[in-house]
């Protein structure tokens, strides 16, 4: 198939490269000309194991099936599907800022000649597809093409930084949200993901669009909840003399619980969990459903991030004339992403405390 991926960040570049590895013809689109030029020259803007090799092989000096362009107009008439993989940062009130997603939708509406699928790959709140469809329809109306047929779908990503390539090529599940009547869009997704479903058709989960949008937020919020829960258990274990690693092993052998996401630490960070928990809390608030559990999860995580500083102060008796090494600043192994990383909170707090203690 021929597809376009708008946005070349973690999600967009990994998605585009892996689709190309599967044999699809892929155009990766980004308005950042410097980034596109670097990609054409084999310079990958992010670190992700296995990604550089795939990009270089599929791009093949411009002769492969992976292409890099600056505007959707350079490929819109060659593709049947356009994926929006641009950022959805948290707004001041915690909601997801959709300006980049809607900008892509606007450009799609300005260019499409119809019978194409617009896919939101970015993590977006429930109701985004309706907004996207409205923007596209408005642009088509301006062009006098208000009868043009197109489809809007949701295909959330489930990629973990540090193992994103593996996650894409060996997915636990593939979630696609399409309207019941959009049989053509559904058929295109079935064709696109066929290599993953040959032996396991149930791996492709097709839902209505709002459910697909909610699945991603609910999944990430559930994982964040497990992290905060185990951090609270670890803190209590420390007070009562229990060993949290032994507790974790005892819990994880219960098939209903499992071993994953039971490791205590200094809180979750990165580009997804903090943003998605905030967005789901805001969605609940806007719809009269206060998300009390997630509000507590967020508060526990905030406190957990500063716990290393308190522990260190206690062990060292203060920071006066102490040299402290922070080993690793990314929010997790096998990535260079420091967004919302606990290390940044501790470094800032340490510098402030060092000044108060009289050290330089």
What are these regions (language model features)?
Residues 1-360:
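Structural/interface elements that position substrates and couple domains in central-metabolism enzymes
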